[in-house]
């Protein structure tokens, strides 16, 4: 920088004059010297040496040149002057002083300029250092702030997870307390009911003892009177005339049972029927409050077993009392063997008359008890069971009766009783029970291939579900769809699949019903009434049970082909069951061509929407993925209005497939005929947000994979890490309970589309029961006791 400044310095006037003078002298010297040199060269070139030839080719003549010789000479002179060595010039004292002052002044200026330049550089460097320092300070502050924010976010996340964990624990504790409270209330009710029954039985036994004692005293008084009258009127007779004047018994046979024995048996039967009618009301109330179907069934069976044991104890006590009474009477009879035979004949006649009276009273009581009309099928089976019980007990009456005994015929029934009695049922399918043995409670819903009712078994008082099969072509034989459904559902028994008890039939071939265990809810109607969605642990529990049921079906080579939330049932115990096998069928390997129009539209796999005819278990797994999303959001995942709209909704969320991600996609029938809009990205993650973890979204993507060959199976789905991360699946017994919507009057829901080729004509499937033989659904007495009309038959 200093050299550049020296070249820029301003010259003084003296220096300029001296410079001009020096240049002028140099020019004059150069001119003289140039002229001298040019003359020498010309003289040399003009005179050729000996033997030298002039070469005209070497001569270059420049014509019309803008430069003149004088100009070139001047330029050359200037150059020579600048390069010439000048002799030292003589300066005066005054000039030297002036020159020294100039030099000092120049030196000061140079020093000032150097110092200013250095200060400027120092300031620039200082600014740069300050800038760097501030930049580092800002970076440190930003880093500290980011670290603080990260730490704060971690603390907030930990606090949120802690609050969420506390909330879940409080919720679980609350549910546990409620469950224990319900169990305690149930135990208290059962204890009170047992105490009430025991008290009633005790009072009944005391009343029977009083009646038997009263009858015994009356017989003794009457026998004393007869003895007194016969002692005065009738002569003594030999013992052999006892058979002739008696009731037809031989002398060696045992005496008939006392007259109160049939009456006691009939009273016990009346008591049993009263207890059964009480048990019906009690079991109904207990089932409404019970939280689990299995526990309610076990408690019901346990109460019935306890009741049977207590009744057996009563019968043993009554038989022991009767045996004691018989022994006393035999002793009295042995003492009176010496009396006349007329007394014995009158006594036997009195016993026969008392027996007839007791039988008449029993018939009257039975006529009063038979409020609900029963079929002969029920009555015959009941009479056979009563006969077996009487034979097993070995009562004196049954052992003492012979061919000669007189038993009066049953009295003729009145016209009113004839109207109450039902005609004998002749089942169309041998070995199946009649539908008359069930009492209809309400109509639940239409399935794919039939109508479902909630009913009660009249014999066991158990609540069951009756599904009436569609039999529109019964004249051509048994429908293949109904046969396939029965065969499939009987083959696929599993804890997470609806349990089939039996098949019952109506009056003719078009009334066939599947009897299944009653389950309180279906997930579709339950989610419509829930105010809050399922918790993550509850969703995992439901998905695990669903995958277990689907795995069992696929392991047995069964395709369900209609998995949706309305076909998934949930009990009060938190047990999920797969139902409605109207579209199910078996499949084999290699795959065959099936109809592509299966599965309800919202849950239909893309290969079915695009017209594929060869498909396998992957269609069920796509439906499982749609159900997974619906459990999280309580809304259908792809609610399309038509097949084209359904395809567009799937492509919009998952992206349009290609041959790369779906081999064979371009060969599908629908792809060849039409062009779909392009959606390059998968936008499904945005629909769930915080509702689904990364592992859960990974499982969702595997359920909703386009290529069926890469779609996850039910067995692999159960092994996914989503079910092992927190929050873990809850125990089914910890599920909350809701009011059973199926026990209320059916309300038509028009939200979910119907399955293909099923359900469209079934909304009036049970309406013709009012005109023909079969179920009669009475809406005026819904929820009545066993004495209500229930299922009524019309012939």
Curated annotation (Swiss-Prot):
Species the sequence originates in: Homo sapiens (Human)
Top enzyme category: transferase
Residues engaged in binding ATP: 444-452, 467
Catalytic activity: L-seryl-[protein] + ATP = O-phospho-L-seryl-[protein] + ADP + H(+); L-threonyl-[protein] + ATP = O-phospho-L-threonyl-[protein] + ADP + H(+)
One of the record's GO cellular component terms: nucleus
Essential cofactor(s): Mg(2+)
GO aspect biological process, one term: apoptotic process
Ranges of compositional bias, category Low complexity: 291-302
Gene: CDK11B
Name assigned to this protein: Cyclin-dependent kinase 11B
Induction conditions: Isoform 7 is induced in G2/M phase of the cell cycle.
Active site per database record: 562 (proton acceptor)
Annotated Basic and acidic residues bias: 17-60, 114-131, 138-227, 238-253, 264-276
Record-linked InterPro entries: CDK, CDK11/PITSLRE_STKc, Kinase-like_dom_sf, Prot_kinase_dom, Ser/Thr_kinase_AS
Complex formation: Cleaved isoform SV9 (p110C) binds to the serine/threonine kinase PAK1 and RANBP9. p110C interacts with RNPS1. Isoform 7, but not isoform SV9, nor its cleavage product p110C, interacts with CCND3. Interacts with CCNL1 and CCNL2. Forms complexes with pre-mRNA-splicing factors, including at least SRSF1, SRSF2 and SRSF7/SLU7. Interacts with isoform 5 of MYO18A. (Microbial infection) Interacts with human herpes virus 1 (HHV-1) transcriptional regulator ICP22.
Post-translational modification Phosphoserine, affected residues: 47, 72, 115, 283, 482, 589, 752
EC number: 2.7.11.22
Role noted for this protein: Plays multiple roles in cell cycle progression, cytokinesis and apoptosis. Involved in pre-mRNA splicing in a kinase activity-dependent manner. Isoform 7 may act as a negative regulator of normal cell cycle progression.
Recorded family membership: Belongs to the protein kinase superfamily. CMGC Ser/Thr protein kinase family. CDC2/CDKX subfamily.
């Amino acid at each position: 920088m200093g050299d550049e400044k020296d070249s820029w310095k301003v010259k003084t006037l003296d220096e300029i004059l001296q410079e001009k003078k020096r240049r002028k002298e140099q020019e004059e010297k150069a001119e003289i010297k140039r002229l001298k040199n040019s003359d020498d060269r010309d003289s040399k070139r003009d005179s050729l040496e000996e033997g030298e030839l002039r070469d005209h080719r070497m001569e270059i003549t420049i014509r019309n040149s803008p430069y003149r010789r004088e100009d070139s000479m001047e330029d050359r002179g200037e150059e020579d002057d600048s390069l010439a060595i000048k002799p030292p010039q003589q300066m005066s004292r005054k000039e030297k002083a002036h020159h020294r002052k100039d030099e000092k002044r120049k030196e000061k200026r140079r020093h000032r300029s150097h110092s200013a330049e250095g200060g400027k550089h120092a300031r620039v460097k200082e600014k740069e250092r300050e800038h760097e320092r501030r930049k580092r300070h800002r970076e440190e502050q930003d880093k500290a702030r980011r670290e603080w924010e990260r730490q704060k976010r971690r603390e907030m996340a930990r606090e949120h997870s802690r609050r969420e964990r506390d909330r879940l624990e409080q919720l679980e504790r609350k549910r546990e307390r409620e469950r224990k409270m319900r169990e305690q209330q149930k135990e208290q009710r059962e204890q009170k009911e047992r105490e009430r029954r025991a008290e009633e039985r005790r009072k009944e036994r005391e009343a029977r003892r009083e009646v038997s004692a009263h009858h015994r005293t009356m017989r003794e008084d009457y026998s004393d009177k007869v003895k007194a009258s016969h002692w005065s009127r009738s002569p003594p007779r030999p013992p052999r005339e006892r058979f002739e004047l008696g009731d037809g018994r031989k002398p060696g046979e045992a005496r008939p049972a006392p007259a109160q024995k049939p009456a006691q048996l009939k009273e016990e039967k009346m008591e049993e029927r009263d207890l059964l009618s009480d048990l019906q009301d009690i079991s109904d109330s207990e089932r409404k409050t019970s939280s689990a179907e299995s526990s309610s069934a076990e408690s019901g069976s346990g109460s019935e077993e306890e009741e049977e044991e207590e009744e057996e104890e009563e019968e043993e006590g009554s038989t022991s009392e009767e045996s004691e009474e018989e022994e006393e009477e035999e002793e009295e009879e042995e003492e009176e063997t010496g009396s006349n035979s007329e007394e014995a004949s009158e006594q036997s006649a009195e016993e026969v008359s008392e027996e007839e009276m007791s039988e008449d009273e029993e018939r009257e009581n039975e006529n009063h008890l038979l409020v609900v009309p029963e079929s002969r099928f029920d009555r015959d089976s009941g009479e056979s069971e009563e006969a077996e019980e009487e034979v097993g007990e070995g009562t004196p009456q049954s052992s003492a009766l012979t061919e000669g005994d007189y038993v009066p015929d049953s009295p003729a029934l009145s016209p009113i009783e004839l109207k109450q009695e039902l005609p004998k049922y002749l089942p169309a399918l041998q070995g199946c029970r009649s539908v008359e043995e069930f009492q209809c409670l309400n109509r639940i819903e239409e399935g794919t291939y039939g109508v479902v009712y909630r009913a009660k078994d009249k014999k066991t008082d158990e609540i069951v579900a009756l599904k009436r099969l569609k039999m529109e072509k019964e004249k051509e034989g048994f429908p293949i769809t109904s046969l396939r459904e029965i065969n499939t559902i009987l083959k696929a028994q599993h804890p997470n699949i609806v349990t089939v008890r039996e098949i019952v039939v109506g009056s003719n071939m078009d009334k066939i019903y599947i009897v299944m265990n009653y389950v309180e809810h279906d997930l579709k109607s339950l989610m419509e009434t829930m105010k809050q969605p399922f918790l993550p642990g509850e969703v995992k529990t439901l998905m695990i049970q669903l995958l277990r049921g689907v795995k069992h079906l696929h392991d047995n080579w069964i395709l369900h082909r209609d998995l949706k939330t309305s076909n998934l049932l949930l009990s009060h115990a938190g047990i999920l069951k797969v139902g409605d096998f109207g579209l199910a069928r078996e499949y084999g390997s290699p795959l065959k061509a099936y109809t592509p129009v299966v599965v309800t539209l919202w849950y239909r796999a893309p290969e079915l929407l695009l017209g594929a005819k060869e498909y396998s278990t992957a269609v069920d797994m796509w439906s499982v993925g749609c159900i997974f999303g619906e459990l999280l959001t309580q809304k259908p995942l792809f609610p399309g209005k038509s097949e084209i709209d359904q395809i567009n909704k799937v492509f919009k969320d998952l992206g349009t497939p290609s041959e790369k991600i779906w081999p064979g996609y371009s060969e599908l029938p629908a792809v060849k005929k039409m062009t779909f809009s392009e959606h390059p990205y998968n936008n499904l993650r945005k629909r769930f947000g915080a509702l689904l973890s990364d592992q859960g979204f990974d499982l969702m993507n595997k359920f909703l994979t386009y290529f069926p060959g890469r779609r996850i199976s039910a067995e692999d789905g159960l092994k996914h890490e989503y079910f092992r991360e927190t929050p873990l699946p809850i125990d089914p017994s910890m599920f909350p309970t809701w009011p059973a919507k199926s026990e209320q009057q059916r309300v038509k829901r028009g939200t979910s589309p119907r399955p293909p080729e099923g359900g469209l004509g079934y909304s009036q499937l049970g309406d013709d029961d009012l005109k023909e033989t079969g179920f009669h659904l009475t809406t005026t007495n819904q929820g009545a006791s066993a004495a209500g009309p229930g299922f009524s038959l019309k012939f």
